[in-house]
């Protein structure tokens, strides 16, 4: 019996330790957006086109890297269910393998087009290099089960203050609403 209790306790503690706290609810009072115009408005990185193409489009124009930094744009590769890929803006780094991002249009159905602030993203890559991530899934109240290939981080020209960056999420969504479709 003591062995079972120890096993149960370690499983419970492990489950608690591996689950980040829930992020705030999606922003109310902001228009529905695609991820690209929102990421452009919040990060100041002036790239266009499908999200997955941002990595190559940044070459020679913006620094790129494998490490997260506030204001950097995380570029996720396209998949069969996410044909344009996805971009999100790093707000802050929580730990070696966890960041918080702001993004738009993550999800489907009623979640489509919403702007979400302070969303956990976890590095699950075997080499700890941010090449494979899992993203918080609001409707399920936990990390999504899908692993997404990440192309890397497109870095802004200057490093923004994380507090100001987080405060600019809603204003950036309103700015992006005027640039939809580009």
Task: Show the residue positions of the predicted features.
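Bacterial signal peptide processing site
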Residues: 17-19
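Intrinsically disordered, low-complexity segments enriched in polar/charged small residues
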Residues: 9-10, 169
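N-terminal export leaders
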Residues: 3-8
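Aromatic- and glycine-rich peptidoglycan recognition patches
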Residues: 96-182
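Secreted/periplasmic proteins that engage bacterial cell-wall peptidoglycan
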Residues: 25-89, 94
């Amino acid at each position: 019996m003591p062995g079972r209790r120890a096993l149960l306790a370690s499983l419970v503690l492990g489950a608690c330790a591996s689950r980040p706290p829930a992020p705030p609810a999606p922003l109310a009072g902001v228009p529905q957006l695609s991820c690209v115009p929102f990421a452009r408005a919040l990060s100041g990185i002036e790239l266009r086109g499908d999200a997955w193409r941002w990595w190559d489009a940044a070459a020679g124009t913006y620094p790129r890297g494998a490490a997260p930094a506030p204001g950097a744009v995380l570029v996720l590769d396209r998949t069969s269910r996410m044909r344009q890929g996805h971009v999100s803006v790093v707000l802050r780094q929580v730990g070696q393998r966890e960041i918080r991002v702001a993004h738009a249009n993550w999800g489907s159905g009623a979640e489509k087009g919403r702007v979400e602030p302070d969303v956990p993203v976890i590095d699950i890559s075997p080499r700890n290099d941010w090449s494979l991530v899992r993203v918080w899934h609001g409707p399920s109240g936990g990390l999504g089960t899908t692993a997404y290939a990440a192309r890397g981080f497109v870095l802004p020209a200057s490093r923004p203050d994380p507090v100001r960056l987080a405060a600019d999420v809603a204003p950036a969504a309103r700015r992006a609403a005027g640039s939809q479709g580009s």
